[in-house]
Amino acid sequence: MSKKVHYHPLTILLHILSALKAWVPFIVIGIIRNGFKDGWETLLIFGGAATLLSMWACVKYFFESYTIDADKMVIYEGIIRKKEIEVTYERMQAIKQRQWFFLVPFHVVSLQIETAGGESKPEVNIPAIPIRVFNEIEHYRQHANDKQEKNFPEQQADEAVIEKSPLYEEQAVKYQLTNRQIFLFGITDLSVFMGIFVVLLTIERFMSKEWVDEVADVTISAVQTGGLFVVAFGILFMVVAMLFAMIKSMITYYHFKVSYFEKTLTIERGLLEKHVQKIPLNKVQGIRIKQNILRRLLGISSVELILAGGQEQKENADNTAKVLLLPIINESELYSVLQMIYADWQMAKPTIQAVSRGRWFYFSRWSIAVLLPLAIISFFFYWWLGTILLLGLLFGIATDLLNSHNQGLAFLSESRLCIQNYQYFTKVQTFIDRAKVQSIEETSTPFLYRKDLAHLSLQLREGNGCLNVKLRYMKGKDIQRVTRFFRTAV
């Protein structure tokens, strides 16, 4: 294929849906704030908007095209300001497929192609393209990678080396979520409670003052009648939040499965829109295992990938803030499944050695020095402010106690280690390959130096920036063990 070809005609529909996704929230908020006008006037407004959107989508589609050759593909776009994007197959680092349910009968997918340019978003976005064309692109890309690996084997030195065996000869599914696991993931996702709270605050800003006053009066009257209303409202809020989380999880992670083939992880998921993400092993900088307080009680965990490049940042637009290798899995089978998926890392449960146990006061001293006097002073003027500050201080001390007691590390092999700490009440274990660490930083103060204490920070590439994995208030001998580990030749 060497001549210019337009995208699939369904691109027009996708352009319209994309525009609606951006404008519908403002339309709904406007209706809530001002109410409906005359029926014909409303119909005229919506009809005119739909016509303009359709015309814009058709014009945009007409000015979009692409060409595919054996050595590169070229994307042409732009109505007034013309743009020509030329991408060779050697520069393609990852290809992400997305397929809405209405695209399935037409054998059409959307593509996002990330290159070695290091942009914060995929360099190439193809709204709709036939699957046969995608297979052609993938064939050329694989051929280019094989040729590059054969001609320049030294460039592959930093990649994970996996011997060819029957295990990797075919792309077999290594792990797949059940519907029960998806629902369990939803009801244990504590972030959804904060999300609903933020949505309610946003809606309140755009509601008319009369509505807000009426709701406030009803709430105050109900609270004055007794605490039963508060309990009932709390239960209702939790039920709604869990239902919302379960629906969101089912839409996002339905038919979630992970497979491995030729040094590439493939993650598939999605109910209304199917996502297929291919991740080369050399792009994986590390692995994070997370357990919030609720999941720890239930004995389940989540596994995230730390990726270099910009593709995972695009996930925010899909309400998924990270790339999950295993959204939810029982602790009893966690490491056996990781070993099956990611065989070259030789995953095993780490034996964590604590490095800051008994030093909780160092973690909390500045919070105590600032918040405690403020809380005491506030009680003389605004008791409610003093209460909030005191509760915040107690919360901070509790998390610092947890972190200081459990922060630690484990040396897994000659080239890998695990660092454990707590982010509030969530346990985080970060598995790091020595070759992926960009730099090591040791910091201290004159006071801490006299106590033989310092902080250690390991920097990894994450997205287009850096991830700092920190260990705080470590003894000098523990820091020396880590620095010797990184200085030792493989």
Spans of model-derived segments:
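N-terminal basic, Ser/Thr-rich segments that initiate or prime the first beta/alpha elements at protein or domain
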Residues: M1-V490
